[in-house]
């Protein structure tokens, strides 16, 4: 079995026969160091949290080559966005051909056949029946748009969300998020009328319930909190427009709720006419082995927010929602570059690649393989408290002897993996979860190599061989 899908074989023989991973100079190398210093002089620190001192030069499939010639296996996928990997021939061809025809037309003022086809496909694969689409540029502005739709369609002022939620960096998205206080410090006043409730984390929740053994008990605690505390004492339910949720919390640490949670939550929300908005920017477009992670929980949201992987990371997002709520004021969802012909070409190619190459099935099979191997590794190392996920969205929680989060150990494991040629980030509300979100084209052969690196990184960290650690959201 090759390390790349057969569709990648227009690549040169050099790439096909490439050794992976390949570390020719200890990262960061001299060229990377030089560029990082130049960046510090001209780019604001606000643009991101630099998880790794990595400067990519090119990519192919699930691999990234940096400016110093090091080749890494990528378990980050540009924040779970590079769904079809890097430089997929079909994607490259579609984008090149479209640029040669016309690179920009604005769907806010004219019409676009490409954008229409992408919207038709999204409506087809969405679990929401009779839906329409609004296009955006990033997950953050798509969250803002979903807030606007929620308030416009219900004429209600309040938004509910979950503790641990990451929804983006625009003002509205920051306002509904509850991931790290560092992302809100200094920006008040944010959008008013937002309230948060606990997310049903089976492994680590405020009630101390083992949600794997007692899922119904955990579900009931959250729903009781919402109905008998929030709706009775904090926010009038008839003034709540929507509840925003990630079907699987991503940046909070790949937190998978009990299977029946969202189905029961939707029943409660419907009693009060409250919309359920699923933020699937990270979980959607095949990441979990289904087009949308909402499908795992047998729930039909009123809106789904998408982004990241829909155009393989090339800057498309949006909202899919029930027709009766999506027709808002003309022009109020207008963004100049949204779904322009080039981005739409990338999205159309991405959706076709996922279908034609059975990447939903691949995400399930390779994800199950990784989960199985990680659970075997867990049996050998007490520092692994939990392994969880769906498809190619997997979290490994690192803990101390007393079960408390161990971000220090997590950061060192991820740094050692980076030195060995694996891009492996640490995330989580406490910075102690290894996040695995590789491109959907990942094969079992490459995954096995990555797992060998993870196990070695754990051993090297436990024996005191690792001094540095990766940066995380803290």
UniProtKB/Swiss-Prot annotation:
Completely inhibited by hydroxylamine hydrochloride. Optimum pH is 6.5-7.0. One of its GO terms (molecular function) is identical protein binding. InterPro entries: Aminotrans_3 (IPR005814), Aminotrans_3_PPA_site (IPR049704), Class-III_PLP-dep_AT (IPR050103), PyrdxlP-dep_Trfase (IPR015424), PyrdxlP-dep_Trfase_major (IPR015421), PyrdxlP-dep_Trfase_small (IPR015422). Changing residue 251 to A: Loss of activity. It is an enzyme of class 5 (isomerase). The keyword Isomerase applies. Its EC number is 5.1.1.-, 5.1.1.1. Its cofactor is pyridoxal 5'-phosphate. Pyridoxal 5'-phosphate binds at residues 139-140, 282, 336. The modification N6-(pyridoxal phosphate)lysine is found at residue 308. Pfam families: Aminotran_3. It catalyses: L-alanine = D-alanine; L-serine = D-serine. The keyword Repeat does not apply. Highly stable at high temperatures. Gene3D superfamilies: Aspartate Aminotransferase, domain 1 (3.90.1150.10), Type I PLP-dependent aspartate aminotransferase-like (Major domain) (3.40.640.10). Keywords: Isomerase, Pyridoxal phosphate. Homohexamer. Belongs to the class-III pyridoxal-phosphate-dependent aminotransferase family. Catalyzes the interconversion of L-alanine and D-alanine, and L-serine and D-serine. Has weak activity with valine and threonine. This is Alanine/serine racemase.
């Amino acid at each position: 079995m090759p390390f790349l899908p057969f569709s990648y074989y227009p690549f040169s023989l050099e790439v096909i026969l490439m050794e992976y991973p390949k570390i020719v100079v200890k990262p960061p190398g001299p060229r990377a160091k030089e560029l990082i210093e130049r960046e510090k002089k001209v780019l604001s620190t606000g643009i991101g949290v630099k998880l790794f001192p990595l400067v990519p030069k090119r990519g192919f499939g699930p691999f990234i080559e940096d400016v110093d010639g090091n080749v890494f296996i990528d378990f980050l996928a540009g924040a779970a966005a590079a769904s079809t990997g890097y430089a997929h021939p079909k994607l490259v061809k579609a984008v090149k051909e479209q640029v040669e025809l016309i690179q920009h037309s604005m769907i806010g003022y004219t019409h676009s056949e490409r954008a229409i086809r992408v919207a038709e496909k999204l409506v087809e694969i969405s679990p929401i029946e009779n839906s329409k689409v609004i296009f955006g540029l990033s997950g953050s502005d798509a969250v803002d748009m979903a807030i606007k739709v929620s308030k416009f369609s219900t004429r209600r002022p309040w938004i509910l969300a979950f503790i641990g939620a990451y929804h983006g960096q625009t003002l509205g998205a920051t306002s509904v998020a509850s991931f790290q206080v560092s992302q809100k410090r200094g920006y008040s006043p944010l959008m008013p009328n937002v309230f948060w409730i606990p997310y049903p984390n089976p492994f680590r929740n405020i009630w101390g319930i083992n949600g794997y053994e007692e899922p119904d008990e955990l579900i009931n605690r959250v729903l009781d909190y919402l109905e008998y505390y929030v709706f009775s004492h904090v926010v009038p339910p008839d003034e709540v427009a929507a509840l925003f949720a990630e079907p699987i919390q991503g940046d909070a640490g790949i937190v998978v709720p009990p299977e029946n949670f969202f189905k029961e939550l939707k029943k409660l929300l419907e009693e009060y006419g409250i919309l359920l908005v699923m933020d699937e920017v990270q979980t959607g477009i095949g990441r979990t082995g289904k087009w949308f992670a909402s499908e795992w929980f047998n729930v039909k949201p009123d809106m789904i927010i998408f982004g990241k992987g829909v155009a393989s990371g090339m800057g498309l997002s949006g909202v899919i929602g029930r027709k009766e709520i999506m027709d808002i004021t003309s022009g109020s969802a207008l963004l100049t570059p949204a779904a322009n012909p080039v981005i739409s070409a990338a999205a159309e190619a991405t959706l076709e690649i996922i279908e034609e190459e059975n990447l939903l099935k691949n995400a399930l099979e390779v994800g199950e393989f990784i989960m199985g191997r990680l659970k075997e590794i867990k049996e050998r190392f007490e520092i692994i408290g939990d392994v969880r996920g769906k498809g190619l969205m997997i979290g490994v929680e690192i803990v101390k002897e007393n079960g408390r989060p161990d971000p220090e150990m997590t950061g060192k494991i991820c740094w050692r993996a980076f030195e060995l040629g694996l891009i492996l980030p640490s995330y989580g509300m406490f910075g102690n979860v290894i996040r695995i979100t590789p491109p959907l084209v990942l094969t079992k052969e490459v995954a096995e190599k990555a797992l060998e690196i993870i196990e070695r990184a754990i051993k090297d960290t436990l024996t005191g061989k690792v001094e540095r650690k990766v940066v995380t959201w803290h």
